Design a protein with these regions (language model features):
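Conserved donor-binding/catalytic core segment of Leloir-type glycosyltransferases
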Residues: 191, 239-257, 263
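Aromatic "clamp/platform" in nucleotide-sugar-dependent glycosyltransferases that forms part
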Residues: 318
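Short alpha-helical donor nucleotide-sugar binding micro-motif in glycosyltransferases
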Residues: 305-310
Length: 407
């Protein structure tokens, strides 16, 4: 069985899930390869693809003329025009918004010919949707790592509701491009990372009638260590007598993560001994003396220290396709307070935390509830490992690939 995974990159959160799945498949004896636009590791089973040759040739003078034309706002092709239009809007509104038109004709790569099954992952900015679904006739599995496959350019439906007015023309155009491309494909199956993601797909006209299997994201427990709480606090320089909450996001200004609501919840709790550890880009002003901003962290050992030092991990997101930080915290034995989104809706219960609403008062009440309970940290980690360990996830994918090939 030859499986080709296609993704924008082997790095980042989505890339980590892909690579855990890929390596676990290799351990099962599957001939698994990865094709990316941006390679961040030295893994020999990963191939990096460069953009297509310039449509006007490789003559250096022609290339120079194109660059000058682009700076003047002129366009030679659909790729140039769509990305010029996106850039104009994103200068004013900095949100993820991607075109289905790219400079990569992935369908013609030799690894596509090599594979028995092609597994798409996060492909925004890499795979040219129209040419790929037109030319590839092999079985395709698309792992939904966010909601972009079922939208035009937006990556989350909640963001679309807020910013549709500014992007309406492009969103409608991109949605029609995707719809036409995917409707012409008879060999597509979907993998949803959670029940909520599957429900989203069921509401998209061109995805609803596709076979859709729920397989959780692969997250390795070996990457996250359950430190003793006081040891973790000592290493991070945190008072062992404090009550510690933690919060993680890419950047604090990302409204979907509800950082502002968490700060208000901290005020509602009204205890000067409660400290909030925040991981992410500090791009908003923080005046509370009870907030400890740690900046962005990529080192998994240090992230393990943050989770392990916490009495509660708080993640009241408005929307998540999966929510891997929930699993990371559970691997460290830390109970979680989360809204009922992504994977949290399925796994958070009285044994490992609490679900909450998205208002500051609801978040504060759930934090109080969790702080008032006692938890078995070892059991929290064990149950999470059963669900999300890469070897367990890989077996489910192996069964899915086999079923598709038999049919």
């Amino acid at each position: 069985m030859k499986i080709l995974h296609i993704a924008l990159t082997d790095g980042g959160g989505a890339g980590m899930g892909l690579m855990n799945q890929h390596r676990a498949l290799l351990q099962l004896g599957v001939d698994s390869r990865v094709l990316v636009a941006i390679k961040q590791s030295k893994d020999a089973t990963i191939t990096e693809m460069r953009p297509n040759q310039n449509v006007w040739g490789s003559n250096k003078y022609v290339v120079l003329l194109q660059k000058i034309a682009r700076r003047m706002g002129l366009s030679f092709n659909l790729y140039d025009r769509t990305h010029r239009d996106i850039y104009k809007i994103k200068k004013k509104i900095a949100i993820p918004f991607s075109s289905p038109i790219t400079q990569y004709d992935v369908s013609r790569h030799p690894l596509v010919d090599w594979a028995d099954v092609i597994n798409l992952h996060f492909i925004s900015g890499f795979v040219d949707i129209p040419s790929f679904f037109k030319n590839v006739k092999k079985p395709i599995v698309w792992t939904m790592r966010d909601e972009n496959p079922g939208l035009g350019g937006f990556h989350y439906a909640e963001t679309k509701q807020v910013h549709y007015k500014e992007f309406s023309e492009l969103e409608d155009k991109f949605l029609n491009i995707k719809r036409n491309a995917i409707e012409s494909c008879s060999n597509l199956s979907i993998v949803s990372l959670s029940k909520i993601m599957r429900q989203f797909c069921d509401g998209v006209d061109f995805l609803a009638n596709r076979p859709n299997t729920i397989i959780y994201n692969a997250i390795s427990p070996d990457d996250y260590t359950m430190f003793k709480r006081n040891e973790a606090r000592h290493e991070l320089g945190i008072n062992p007598d404090n009550i510690v909450l933690s919060f993680v996001c890419c950047q604090f200004s990302e409204k979907r993560k509800r950082f502002a609501e968490v700060l208000e919840a901290l005020d509602i709790l009204g205890d000067k001994h409660i400290k909030l550890l925040c991981v992410g880009k500090r791009d908003v002003e923080i005046t509370s003396p009870n907030v400890i901003a740690l900046g962005s962290i990529s080192d998994r050992r240090r992230m393990s220290l943050v989770y392990s030092a916490s009495d509660v991990f708080v993640t009241p997101s408005a929307q998540e396709s999966f929510g891997k930080t929930v699993v990371e915290a559970l691997y460290c034995g830390t109970p979680v307070v989360s809204t009922s989104v992504g994977i949290a809706a399925e796994i958070i219960n009285e044994n490992n935390g609490a679900l909450c609403g998205g208002t500051p008062s609801e978040i504060a009440e759930a934090i109080r509830q969790v702080l008032g309970n006692k938890y078995n940290q070892t059991e929290i980690r064990r149950l999470a490992t059963e669900k999300f360990a890469p070897e367990n996830v890989a077996r489910q994918y192996f069964s899915l690939y086999n079923e598709i090939l038999k049919n």
